[in-house]
């Protein structure tokens, strides 16, 4: 088990009766293989990744992204007081209840969010990034018109009051080629408008090859790398590195429906590959996921610093 990458690739490509192992099996098995390689060689998991990809070991934290679930007000207060780097996800997955038929509810929420940060922060240097997942709902209220979608998204910038704003999944075009085309048109229109709001790809961007295709098309500013969807965790490393190399911001995400083990493993992957941000997980209670990810990251950084 000395070599993680060789073993991970073997099981990621293994076919039984003509079929690859389920992505979840490959995801979990590759985590066990990384842990085994670290234990067998007396290294941290982050060190194993750095060594096998010939990356520098950088003992510096990756910005963490807190997700609120539907508790998008109380959870935000917790995030502000704990100084979370990126917030709040917000789960804007319903037009009538959360977005508004003219986008007015999201506009009001972004205004409340920025006001809340500015009034509750304990240090004026705290300047978090706003990252809101809208699950394709903006496209629904603007009839999938990329210009109208972009105009609305650009108008939210003023409500953010100087805080960086990312909108994830503004549209769901129903298939990958159309999704790339729609996101590209929205991104280009935002540039034409001089907007600083950034677009994050989510829907139809699942596998390593999808991430490459969305990146090569310049379809957005950031892609979510949905860690369980890539199978073996070595694919996460490759995806982050591809984004970093080609000027695409990498968001190492995943799902609230993971385990404490996978969350901690993802910390090591992030510390090695260096995405722009990492999702706090598992769960949507926020506190639990923050404790798991924050503590693992800081333990690992402290151990890396002792080896310098």
List PLM regions with ranges.
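Structural signal for hydrophobic packing residues in well-ordered secondary-structure cores
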Residues: 29, 33-41, 45, 49, ...
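Catalytic cores of large soluble enzymes that bind and process phosphate-bearing ligands
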Residues: 17, 21-29, 76, 93-94, ...
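Charged, long alpha-helical assembly modules
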Residues: 84-88, 95-140, 144
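Glycine-rich, mobile lid/loop segments that gate access to catalytic sites or pores
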Residues: 35-109
């Amino acid at each position: 088990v000395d070599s993680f990458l060789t073993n991970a690739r073997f099981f990621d490509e293994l076919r039984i009766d003509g079929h690859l192992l389920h992505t979840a099996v490959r995801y979990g098995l590759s985590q066990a293989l990384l842990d085994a390689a670290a234990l067998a060689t007396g290294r941290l998991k982050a060190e194993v990744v750095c060594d096998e990809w010939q990356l520098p070991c950088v003992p510096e934290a990756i910005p963490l992204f807190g997700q609120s679930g539907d508790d998008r007000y109380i959870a935000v207060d917790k995030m502000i007081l704990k100084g979370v780097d990126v917030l709040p996800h917000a789960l804007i997955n319903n037009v009538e209840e959360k977005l508004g038929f003219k986008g007015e509810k999201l506009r009001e929420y972004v205004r409340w969010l920025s006001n809340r940060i500015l009034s509750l922060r304990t240090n004026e240097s705290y300047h978090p990034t706003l990252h809101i997942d809208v699950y394709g709902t903006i496209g629904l209220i603007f009839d999938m018109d990329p210009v109208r979608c972009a105009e609305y998204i650009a108008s939210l910038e003023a409500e953010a009051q100087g805080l960086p704003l990312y909108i994830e999944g503004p549209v769901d075009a129903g298939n990958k080629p159309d999704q790339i085309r729609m996101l590209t048109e929205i991104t280009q229109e935002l540039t034409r408008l001089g907007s600083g709001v950034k677009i994050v790809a989510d829907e139809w961007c699942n596998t390593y090859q999808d991430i490459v295709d969305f990146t090569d098309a310049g379809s957005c500013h950031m892609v979510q790398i949905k860690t369980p969807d890539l199978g073996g965790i070595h694919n996460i490393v490759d995806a982050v590195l591809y984004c970093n190399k080609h000027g695409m911001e990498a968001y190492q995400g995943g799902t609230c429906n993971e385990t404490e083990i996978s969350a901690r493993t993802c910390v090591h992957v992030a510390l090695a590959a260096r995405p722009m941000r990492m999702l706090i997980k598992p769960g949507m209670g926020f506190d639990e996921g923050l404790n798991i990810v924050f503590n693992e990251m800081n333990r690992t950084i402290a151990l890396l610093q002792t080896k310098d």
